[in-house]
Amino acid sequence: MKKELILKALKLRDMGFPSGDIAEELNISVKTALYLTLNGEELLKAGETPKEDSEKLDIFLEWDNVRASSRRLRNISKIICDMLSDVEFDGIVGISSGGVPLATLISDELDKNFSIYVPKKHVHTEKEKTTGFIGQNMSSIVGKDVIIVDDVMTSGNSVKETIKYLKGIANPKKVFVVMDKSGIDEIDGVKIEHLFRTGVVDIKK
């Protein structure tokens, strides 16, 4: 288990993040997030994950070297633009926060309307929040055909929430993610497209 991942999970836990939000932030499953928040200190002391728990571990995706560079992000956005060549749409919605930089670059490249969806996990309020909201240029996508962009899809919860919200004001046609860990091809009738997808191969000795 990577020490940096454990430390990030513990830091988010101490900041008050629930396991579901930690999972989304670190691109890991909810079970893995819960495991790290409950056992992180012991794992750090031990220096490695106990063998009996190894089958419970999840795949951790890190692409900081890409998203830290606007030039590299633009190259990724051009690949997505190429994948969009046969899709007719009016606007792009980036899911906050990871999908926003890519959605911005894609909208600039294709000269499309741009908007942001802020999931409920990023809405900090004393009252329980049941949904997120459109954070920018809502009027530009109302009644329009739109695509949704995010960086990593882990459980699919944020994408599902975004699709549900947008169906009330627009027509979501497709979802594009850079990396997919969920294995989900479609949510509520909306197709999921990915650049990369992870999977687990069970090799028995």
From Swiss-Prot:
| Alphabetical UniProt keywords | DNA-binding, Transcription, Transcription regulation
SUPFAM superfamilies recorded for this chain?
A: PRTase-like
Q: Which one Pfam family would you cite for this protein?
A: Pribosyltran
* Source taxon at top rank: Archaea
Q: Does the keyword Transmembrane helix apply?
A: no
Provide the domain comment. Answer: Contains an N-terminal DNA-binding winged helix-turn-helix domain and a C-terminal regulatory domain (or effector binding domain) resembling phosphoribosyltransferase (PRT) domain.
User: Which family would the database say this protein is a member of?
Assistant: Belongs to the purine/pyrimidine phosphoribosyltransferase family. GfcR subfamily.
From the Swiss-Prot or TrEMBL record, give the protein name: Transcriptional regulator GfcR
